Design a protein with these regions (language model features):
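Hydrophobic residues within alpha-helical transmembrane segments
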Residues: 15, 19-22, 49, 71-78, ...
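Hydrophobic alpha-helical transmembrane segments of multi-pass membrane transport proteins
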Residues: 18-37, 57, 83, 101-116, ...
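A helix-boundary/kink motif common to multi-pass secondary transporters
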Residues: 39, 65-67, 125-126, 186-189, ...
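Non-cytosolic membrane-interface motifs at loop->transmembrane helix junctions
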Residues: 42-46, 98-101, 160
């Protein structure tokens, strides 16, 4: 079934999917370089702005209605994420400006990737879209590795294990779920809930690392959850 659909995918959807994969590559490229060039607080907060990019695309490009209450919920969630990251506005000037720009570009690429995926998934099944968008991303990665002459050999076994785990669980696993979700909810919904990753990061750090959050981080998590629940409530009301 998937093979037949793969052959029948229109040129427009093939092009859109490749573009989405290229934006996903752009997100990864900018994000991983950003964390090397600037402080983590700046990188996390700036890269998490992708819901705002999706809002702009949803309203001005796809001409869909987004209520002010939905936007408020997303802003609250982003504010909570900022609190969890321990972000201080002074960090922007202390970090490397190029790193800050790359982190912001990572947010833009993520927003574009989500928005395009949402449109393509209306005509292409989840499995086929996931295969095509990851293939496009890997092609871009291969070109990037060759163009930048980045070595892929010579690292330690521990490094390769960590890279494999990051790739399979955090990248392929998470983004496969995102892309499958587009068949049931819109990109703004997915983008908004993805911004709640800081809460799960805190929970996992307690379970696996024994690191307990500060009061400030707990407050931030509460704001994130409140913002997402607020957004979810008014999104559900709008659908009705």
């Amino acid at each position: 079934k998937e093979r037949k659909e793969l052959v029948s995918v229109s040129k427009k959807n093939h092009l859109s999917t490749f573009l989405a994969g290229a934006f996903l590559f752009g997100h990864f490229f900018c994000w991983f370089n950003a964390v090397k060039l600037t402080n983590i607080g700046s990188a996390v907060v700036l890269a998490a702005l992708h819901p705002l990019v999706v809002i702009v695309l949803t309203v001005f490009v796809f001409k869909r209605k987004v209520s002010m209450r939905q936007i408020l919920g997303i802003v609250l969630a982003l504010l909570g994420g900022t609190m969890v990251a321990g972000f201080d506005y002074r960090e922007l000037s202390q970090g490397n400006f190029i790193g800050d720009i790359l982190a912001f570009l990572a947010a833009i690429f993520m927003g574009l990737y989500f928005a395009i995926g949402n449109e393509v998934r209306k005509e292409v099944s989840g499995k086929v879209y996931v295969f095509l968008v990851f293939l496009a991303c890997w092609i871009c990665f291969t070109i990037g590795v060759i163009a930048t002459k980045t070595p892929v050999l010579g690292y330690s076994l521990k490094d390769y294990v960590l890279i494999l785990g990051l790739t399979l669980v955090c990248q392929i696993g998470a983004h496969a779920v995102f892309n499958l979700c587009f068949g049931y909810v819109d990109s703004l919904y997915v983008s908004a809930w993805e911004s709640g990753e800081s809460v799960f990061a805190i929970i996992l750090s307690i379970i696996f690392l024994g690191q307990f959050p500060t009061q400030w981080e707990i407050m931030g998590c509460a704001v994130v959850v409140a913002g997402l629940l607020y957004y979810n409530y008014f999104s559900s009301k709008q659908e009705k």
